[in-house]
Amino acid sequence: MVRRAPGASLALLLWVTAVSGSPAGPGAATARRQDEAFSTARCTSRCLSLQITRISAFFKHFQNNGSLAWCQNHKQCSKCLEPCKESWDLKKNHCQSFCEPLFPKKNYECLTSCEFLKYILSVKQGDCPAPEKASGFAAACVESCEADSECSGVKKCCSNGCGHTCQVPKNLYKGVPLKPRKELKFIELQSGDLEVKWSSKFNISIEPVIYVVQRRWNQGIHPSEDDATNWQTVAQTTDERVQLSDIRASRWYQFRVAAVNVHGTRGFTAPSKHFRSSKDPSAPPAPSNIRIANISANNDGTVNVMITWDLPEEPDIPVHHYKVFWSWTYSKYVIPAKKKRRKITDGPQNYVVLEGLQPNSNYNVELQAVTRWGQIRLKSAKVSLHFSTAQDNRNNNEQTSAGKPPKGLVDPYPTFQRRKPTRFLKIGTPFYQDNQLQVKVYWKKTDINMNQFQVHSLLESCVHNDTKGLEKVTELTYENYMILKDLSFSCKYKVTVLPAKSKSRFKAESIFFVTPSCSAFKEKTHKHINCAAEEVPVLPKVLAKPENLSASFIVQEGNITGHFSWKISKAVLHQPMTGFQVTWAEVTTESRQNSLPNSIISQSQILPADHYVLTVPNLRPSMLYRLEVQVLTTGGEGPATIKLFRTPDLPPFLPHRPHLKQHHPHHYKPPPEKY
């Protein structure tokens, strides 16, 4: 080694740290996703290599997509493939904890494949050069890296004799297949699918080659690489073609292909020319799950209603705007279209506020999504919602869609408005003072002996879900009024007033009121209020979760019947519980046409709220099943509780039925043993 001046070492340390530190930012995330795609393909190639003798017996040439399908359905080979999937995070899971639940008895193939994947995710392809070959900054006596992942590009973290630096490896492409030819062919099939073809150069690899196919796309009239999405892996195949069924009209697609074997890859081909489907884009889907989010009362007695809906997941063209029509109805008969009122909201917005509606009235709302394709407007089917602003009729709301029967409205916030002023109790106009929203409650004294009152105020619900439990405040006053302070915007409150002494004839009186939204209040009063906390309504989360999932099995006359039971946690339910959704799935690696290993054959059933047991007949012996239970409420689904169970073996002389059948979860019998 050459002796260096002390100052040079410091300068080298600073420079190396700057240029070879851990990569960060969007580019690093893209590189990490690319490395993971290559690693899973190397993992798959290894599994095929281990079975190459068997594969050759079935196929004249193992470089055929049938070889991958064969491996997916072969007992040992499918176990090897299981860790190669991209659906699990190796950093958060140990190989033992991943493989044992799937293969409790024999998991050697899974474990060795998992350890190989773990190794290649941390160690880049190629070999470190000899320490004495390091030169320039790579020869600096510094510890600038600890792992290959800290080095950019293809560089590896290598020793130089007195430290570790990022260095260009040797034998980078030893045994690695050549890149495919960059020209890709696109064939649009009559079914609407797209077939992408490529060809390979002379293959120097004796191991099976996995082709990783990625794509990106942009929306618009013209192709654009600047506005394109990130590259996403759409297929891994051993064939030199892939057929894609999720091609959308109006998108400009680009593809690239990499050839990978167990030793590594030379990277992707250059991005292909742009491809766009010749199909015309479809009209947007009709808005779904239209519902009432909130109803609030105005000072003049009118009512504001907030309507919300679910945005479509992936239309051919993004929704440009929504048309909202509403009209007063009589006995659910809609008035003529000429008298309908209309609003337009932006495409990304999923709610609208209908202002100035009359109390104790029926209304019908129609909603339609609109997209633009050049000069053409594409419109969805209309969906409608019938609702009432009268409190007595709040449970009679109906949701209808064109050509579909009415569905029950999921109403997370019960329809409410300010009650008619009672004889004794009234609510004043909300006002803003001392940086607080306040309101005055006042009442009439009917007895001169009443000189002290209890005032209970209860926060019932808020549109923005900012309630800290159910906040209840009790105060005493000698006056015939009380100013309620520190109120929240867009919330429903209940106020109850009763005499401090129970001997009085004055009975407890209650009144409901709804505070205005921050933005509406600010606009009317011109107050300087910070409305940053007011957001688009977020429905209260369902916190209730099934617990203590257990299973027992009864074997009778060659049939296995499973009894699954659970308990419910004592979480606060913001909405009434309507039942349970139970999904059970067979986790299998058996040979099934067009199926992947660990494919899930699932069935689902809705149980009433008082049913905590599910009975499933005709289960398969010695099979792993996944049970998933969710609490259902009027406001949505709770978090799922998932557990794996394995059915017992059948005695050798007993036949078994190989198919799952629909069942009815009744007549639960206590099982002999639990799992």
From Swiss-Prot:
Region annotation Disordered: where it falls in the sequence: 388-413, 654-675
GO annotation (BP), single: neuron differentiation
PROSITE patterns tied to this protein: FN3, WAP
Residues bearing carbohydrate: N65, N203, N294, N465, N548, N559
UniProt signal peptide: 1-21
GO cellular component, one term: cell surface
Biased composition (Polar residues): 388-402
Tissue: Mainly expressed in neurons of the central nervous system during the second half of embryonic life. Expressed in mitral neurons of the olfactory bulbs, striatal neurons, Purkinje cells of the cerebellum, retinal neurons and neurons of the brainstem and spinal cord.
InterPro entries: Anosmin-1, Anosmin-1_Cys_box, Elafin-like_sf, FN3_dom, FN3_sf, Ig-like_fold, WAP_dom
Domain WAP: 121-170
Regions of compositional bias (Basic residues) in chain numbering: 656-669
Function: May be an adhesion-like molecule with anti-protease activity.
Protein name: Anosmin-1
Organism name: Gallus gallus
